[in-house]
Amino acid sequence: MFSFVQRFQNVSNQAFSMGIVMVVFIMASSYYQLINNNAFSVPSNIDNVKTLINVRTSRYFGSQRGKAKENMKIKFDLNTDLTPLFNWNTKQVFVYLTAEYNSTEKITSEVTFWDKIIKSKDDAVIDVNDLRSKYSIWDIEDGKFEGKDLVFKLHWNVQPWVGLLTYGETVGNYTLTVENKNKV
């Protein structure tokens, strides 16, 4: 007959194997639900973006050796419905607004202006006007934003209870050319 240790090992191996199978099933079914809900083609409307540029000499705002740097914040309108990102395995959704721009000839920079954690499906509809960005950004290369084209996009990250993180971005973006007159 089998000893107690062999029986315990047999039962624990069975439980572990079944646990792995359940986790894989949960991951696959929740990803399938995201595809079924068209989560990868959620529309967003980013509008009315206004830049607020300050010149700062503090090292907390990117200045080095007392040389002034332009710091930019924005005001924007955002309208999107992120309810397709929620299913039974969604713990929370992390949403963030980014801007891409060419800092030098061959380098594209991407910076984050705003983010939010959405914990329930009830809060998944975002409709805000004249919202001020959470973060102030500066360009590391030359420190000037004027004349640069910024392409704003809304990204999301689904954080599940079980499984891998799922990343994506909404459909719709906003392009803005920074002008010199917006300095504060």
UniProtKB/Swiss-Prot annotation:
Q: Which UniProt keywords apply?
A: Endoplasmic reticulum, Glycoprotein, Membrane, Signal-anchor, Transmembrane, Transmembrane helix
- Highest taxon above the source species: Eukaryota
| Segment forming the signal sequence | none
The entry annotates sugar attachment on 102, 173
Q: Do the record's keywords include Endoplasmic reticulum?
A: yes
Q: Which residues cross the membrane?
A: 15-35
Subunit structure as annotated in this protein's UniProt entry? Component of the signal peptidase complex (SPC) composed of a catalytic subunit SEC11 and three accessory subunits SPC1, SPC2 and SPC3. The complex induces a local thinning of the ER membrane which is used to measure the length of the signal peptide (SP) h-region of protein substrates. This ensures the selectivity of the complex towards h-regions shorter than 18-20 amino acids. Interacts with SEC11. SPC associates with the translocon complex.
Protein's job = Essential component of the signal peptidase complex (SPC) which catalyzes the cleavage of N-terminal signal sequences from nascent proteins as they are translocated into the lumen of the endoplasmic reticulum. Essential for the SPC catalytic activity, possibly by stabilizing and positioning the active center of the complex close to the lumenal surface. Essential for viability.
Name the chain's protein: Signal peptidase complex subunit 3
Organism for this UniProt entry = Saccharomyces cerevisiae (strain ATCC 204508 / S288c) (Baker's yeast)
